[in-house]
Amino acid sequence: MEEVIVPEGKEQQEKYDGSSIQVLEGLEAVRKRPAMYIGDISLKGLHHLVYEVVDNSIDEALAGFCDEIAVHINEDNSITVQDNGRGIPVDMHPKEHKSALEVVMTVLHAGGKFNKDSYKVSGGLHGVGVSCVNALSTKMHVEVYRDGQIHSQDYEKGKPLAPVHVISEAEATGNWEQRKTGTFVQFWPDDTIFTETVYHWEILANRMRELAFLNAGIKIVLKDKRVVDAEGNCKRETFYSEKGLSEFVRYIDGTRTPLISEVIHLNTDKYGTPVEVAMIYNTDFNENVHSYVNNINTIEGGTHVAGFRAALTRVMKKYAEDSKMLEKAKLKDKDGNSTIDPNDFREGLTAVISVKVAEPQFEGQTKTKLGNSEVAGMVSSAVAEALQNYLEEHPDDAKKIVEKVILAAQARIAARNARQSVLRKSPLSGGGLPGKLADCVSKDAAECELFLVEGDSAGGTAKTGRDRVHQAILPLRGKILNVEKAMEHKVFESEEVRNIFTALGITFGTEEDPKALNLSKIRYHKVIIMADADVDGAHIATLIMTLFFRHMKEVIEQGHLYIACAPLYKCSKGNYSEYCWNDQQRFDFIQKYGAGDEKAIKTQRYKGLGEMSDEQLWETTMDPARRMLKQVTIENAAEADRIIAMLMGDDVAPRREFIEENATYANIDA
């Protein structure tokens, strides 16, 4: 696990040399078990390679020695990362007896971040560093501009081809015209290791944008040299944030209607660790808190989130009680005690929490939950002070927040009654399963699947075509409720929503939190959304995904949610047939079997799942051996939050703009 980088002061520059590099572990196992080091060997792991290299540059920036990072996707799908930091040390390592640059690039867990004289804290989740990237690349080229010279070395699959040597600017690959210090790294991912080797612009852009918000004042330039316009200019975007998290919250909340005039923003290290928090209230009903430790998105929260929530509840509750607004709203019991709930203070809240911790302890299912107990108090103290000051200085905003809290409390009481119906109808409490559910025979959740099927017609076909032992079917009547626009009690008043909860066996209440979602008795480990392959079907699938993202996010985070891919066409030539999932596959079939003549091919277009026979539905969409499933994951929670709010919320203008920008790439039924 890598630590985080926090400025130590310019006097530390003298200490950043070969003796700063400490060797903790060798590289041998990386190529044999790559998933252990980068998470997986598909799309996520592929992009993680870029993050590892960029993290080194971010570390330099946080230490105060770098303010610009360039990330390029090259024509050959290699990646280039260049910064204007101090440059990796190149002098002789005292123990390894080779250049410190070679040690950093070829030994796992070797780097300045393990020496507190060089960096106080540093980024990166897995903490494997550039040596792991080197090991998983067919080749890598590195250049370091330091002490007036450019030092270079090349590698193949992690092994150096020659010692570190000095080259001229004319021989260099990096752009050193404006920079006279820094590090340049270019690597080619190994296609014998990764199942996917094509980099996605949006994935990298989202992470670079996130890093720019989290580290104010750093300019990150992303270029895609694979995409060139008519003037010969490649695709390019610059990410820079002057105000950091304050702008991040505005970006996330872009399509929501703000409740208060300003972002509440604090940035301090006076309580023992650097804490930055930005928060704002909107008129929506959801809580959206995004937390980071050393630039790592802690999707499971942790002690920093607990400290934030404790301070928010304590300060807001005191203000609400002192203002006598709770009494007027009759939110006090017979003894005069407040019946307000901590959750009431978080409805309509969007916040980003970022802390820098020297030695973070991560725990939880995905190792993205902060466990350092001391951080809770530090964050709580910092947030309490800033929030108290804001409420005193902005009484009009304070009143609006308390009024919203009161509405949230009143809605919560209504929602509690609606939620109780979910508990009462849970199969675990003896209330029985939904009448429309065709359950499977097996009771082993790990091997059971639940298909959420659009419409009774397709539901009937799926019931007869399924594997009855392992596959259950729950037909849904038309478009389910858009939960993005609904208050919580309305969500649980919806019969379709209640049926999904009940069928899954999901209840509320854990040992830690009586209101938390409880997945301990989930009845299926695969929940598969099966909708028509047209625009209406995509809309229904999006509504269902929104329900899970807002009210059952743990189902997604634990890897249970999938989307079935139904074919659009069945193309036949004589007795030979193929299913086609898109127009390109249909075109290829026509070219191959009809010599390009569309009339020579019999094409059946499926406007809906109900048009297929049970046998066709089984062999194309439900058979585990032949079907295609897309797993729903949350790669970037803040960006997912923003996109869902934009697409499913009330504000039309941003949604129209998004559609216009992406219409070229859309598959539109017309």
PLM regions: where:
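GHKL-family ATPase ATP-binding module
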Residues: M1-S20, L27, L49-Y51, D59-A61, ...
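Conserved helix-loop functional segments at active or binding sites
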Residues: A29-K32, M36, D59, A63, ...
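Conserved short strand/loop->alpha-helix "switch" segment adjacent to the catalytic nucleotide/phosphoryl-transfer site
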Residues: K32-Y51
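Glycine-rich ATP-lid/hinge loop adjacent to the conserved G-boxes
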Residues: Y37-I41, G112-G123
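A short glycine-centered beta->alpha linker in the GHKL/HATPase_c
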Residues: G87-M92, E96
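Helical (often loop-to-helix) elements that flank the catalytic cores of nucleotide-handling enzymes
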Residues: P94, E363-V375, Y579-Q585, F589-I590
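C-terminal interaction appendages of subunits in large macromolecular complexes
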Residues: Q410, A414-S429, D444-E449, G460, ...
